[in-house]
Amino acid sequence: MTDHSPAAASDNAPLRGHALLDSLTATVAADGTDLLGTREEAVPWLRRAGLLPDDAAISNSEHGALLRLRDALRDVLAARASGAADPDATARLTRALADGRLVVTVSPAGAAALASSARASYSNVVAAIAIAVAQAW
């Protein structure tokens, strides 16, 4: 099991909850500027957010998955804000969050927590985002 808490790559604490979701959805601007537009741009952003360790990177396919996750999250949030349901967006977000491979762990004292069962860096990024979604909603 992997602790869902990503290691901060800098002195900044990892983003959590609403702050993480707000920051992730704000990575693309109305004018088309995209802070995650390329893998080379996404990796430093993930590190600054405390989601990706300094010694880790993401593959091209993981970068594409990250963009799909971000876009699905933006679509779900837009639907929630308008009070309308968007089954397609929620299905896309659910599929994207599955990459986090979350499991529930229980401590000897009986406290439950979420953790990623994956060892891959990208899965831990997704796990942190999935936990933020669960905590925020």
Name each model feature, range by range.
Residues 1-137:
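Short helix-coil boundary/hinge micro-motifs
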